[in-house]
Amino acid sequence: MLRFLVFASLVLCGHSTEDVPETDARVVGGAEARRNSWPSQISLQYQYGGSWHHTCGGTLIRSNWVMTAAHCVDSPMTYRVVVGEHNLSQNDGTEQYVNVQKIVSHPYWNKNNVVAGYDIALLRLAKSVTLNNYVQLGVLPREGTILANNSPCYITGWGRTRTNGELAQTLQQAYLPSVSYSICSSSSYWGSSVKNTMVCAGGDGVRSGCQGDSGGPLHCMVNGQYAVHGVTSFVSSMGCNVARKPTVFTRVSAYISWMNNVIASN
């Protein structure tokens, strides 16, 4: 719901409805992930009407810090993070619930211009979580790392399983190979909407991110190890799984120094 406001403002800025990014990105065309197979994945939830509601994903990068998308925390709400989560509708016995104490969005983030980039935020938790088999820190890439075209990647999240569908209750995953910047920024793909501080993945018209996946990780295999190379940012307003409109992510390796500075100063 919150990201549709961003989408509406982009339309007013003159973008064609064929190419307007919709920043409310769930896993379409995926399958249920094996329980706790992605232990750095978190559920970001907001409080409303006395209940907590899933709104975005995120990645645990320190025991008391989470990386997510800036558009996920634009609204002044009370947020909490759930780690060790798999099924949102039941208690798995592995969850830990921690309130968000501080939100630090990138200073250049503009909610009215998502295609400018900088869609990244860090959340400081009220206390450190306990690391175990179900809760682990995400591995981040080296600063400046650029994925090769067609690198093996997975998107994970509790987002919608189809355009305008329902949120998933169990964590989903979908194989989304990366798409190089040169291809993704071509006129037959996203054109100038995609910047070199972003990562594209998918675009086969079958599998994609969708509403509810925003802020969550893109896990990519490089040198035999999965690392979180992307933060789910936007999809096409024509639908989540549109051919030649790959899911677009904030490129994590472009913000390593910024994140280190935020954590060190907070």
From Swiss-Prot:
Signal sequence, start to end: 1-16
Residues listed as glycosylation sites in the UniProt record: 87
UniProt enzyme class: hydrolase
Residue ranges the record assigns to the propeptide: 17-26
Note accompanying the cofactor annotation: Binds 1 Ca(2+) ion per subunit.
Organismal lineage: Eukaryota, Metazoa, Chordata, Craniata, Vertebrata
EC number: 3.4.21.36
Similarity section: Belongs to the peptidase S1 family. Elastase subfamily.
UniProt main location, coarse: secreted
Classification via Gene3D superfamilies: Trypsin-like serine proteases
Subcellular location: Secreted
Official protein name in the record: Chymotrypsin-like elastase family member 1
GO cellular component terms, A-Z: collagen-containing extracellular matrix; extracellular region
Keyword Signal: yes
Active site: 71 (charge relay system), 119 (charge relay system), 214 (charge relay system)
Function, in words: Serine proteases that hydrolyze many proteins in addition to elastin.
Chain sites annotated for binding Ca(2+): 85, 87, 90, 95
GO molecular function: metal ion binding; serine-type endopeptidase activity
InterPro entries to which the protein is assigned, alphabetical: Peptidase_S1_Elastase_sf, Peptidase_S1_PA, Peptidase_S1_PA_chymotrypsin, Peptidase_S1A, Trypsin_dom, TRYPSIN_HIS, TRYPSIN_SER
Reactions mediated catalytically: Hydrolysis of proteins, including elastin. Preferential cleavage: Ala-|-Xaa
Organism for this UniProt entry: Mus musculus (Mouse)
